[in-house]
């Protein structure tokens, strides 16, 4: 049976929540999809912001430092070192620096997303045939023009592959961002664990 289009379970949960007899943090069925949509939107925002920053910074650093072997190796080493820090520890390290919320979460996700992008860009540029660079020099291209018109277009397939890998890392790690108040799909998990509410989880 249903009441005004609502199932009995929905009506009962709403009445209990209104009366303060049920956990207000556990969404009733009518609220489930709206909360899920909100958490999903925040999760996507965190991921896209981090990927955008990592893409711009990672590709730019790789392009600038690629001619210098030691600097490029140092960049890869630092990015790899960041990957060894546990996700929750890196998020916790952000708190004394920039507080809690979206900003520290985006910074942490950005740092995690750097390695695949930098590595893919450096690998792609190093694999470019020298003849293309020779032709660019013969045409009188400046260093910036050579990067923009030769290196980036030829390296783009590898860069996109690096971005895909970074996206997988960011999407997974963004779940933990809820522990520092950034929201996202990890929010109901964190709240459910804190309240010992398996229904919410």
Residue ranges and their predicted role:
Residues 48-64:
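Internal alpha-helical transmembrane segments of multipass membrane proteins
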Residues 125-131, 135-155, 182:
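Short helix-to-coil transition segments within interhelical loops
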Residues 109, 162-201:
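Non-cytoplasmic
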Residues 38-47, 91-116, 200:
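Loop-to-helix entry region at the N-terminal start of transmembrane alpha-helices
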Residues 6-7, 14-52:
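Periplasmic/extracellular loop-to-transmembrane helix junction in inner-membrane transport proteins
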Residues 33-49, 72, 76-82, 95, ...:
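Alpha-helical membrane-interface segments at transmembrane helix boundaries
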Residues 48, 111, 143-177:
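Transmembrane alpha-helices
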Residues 61-94, 109, 117-127, 134:
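Cytoplasmic-entry segments and transmembrane alpha-helices of multi-pass inner-membrane transporters
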């Amino acid at each position: 049976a249903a009441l005004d289009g609502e199932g009995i379970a929905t009506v009962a949960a709403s009445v209990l929540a209104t009366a303060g007899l049920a956990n207000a943090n556990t969404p009733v069925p009518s609220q489930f999809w709206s909360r899920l949509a909100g958490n999903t939107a925040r999760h996507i925002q965190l991921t896209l912001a981090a990927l955008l920053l990592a893409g711009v910074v990672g590709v730019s650093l790789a392009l600038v430092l690629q001619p210098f072997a030691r600097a490029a190796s140092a960049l890869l080493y630092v990015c790899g070192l960041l990957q060894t820090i546990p996700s929750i520890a890196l998020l916790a390290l952000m708190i004394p620096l920039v507080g809690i919320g979206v900003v520290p979460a985006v910074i942490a996700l950005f740092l995690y997303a750097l390695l695949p992008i930098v590595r893919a860009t450096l690998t792609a540029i190093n694999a470019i045939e020298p003849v293309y660079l020779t032709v660019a020099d013969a045409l009188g291209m400046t260093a910036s023009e050579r990067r923009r018109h030769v290196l980036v277009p030829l390296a783009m397939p590898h860069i996109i592959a690096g971005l895909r890998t970074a996206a997988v890392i960011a999407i997974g790690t963004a779940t933990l961002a809820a522990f520092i108040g950034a929201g996202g799909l990890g929010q109901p998990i964190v709240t459910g664990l804190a309240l010992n509410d398996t229904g919410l989880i």
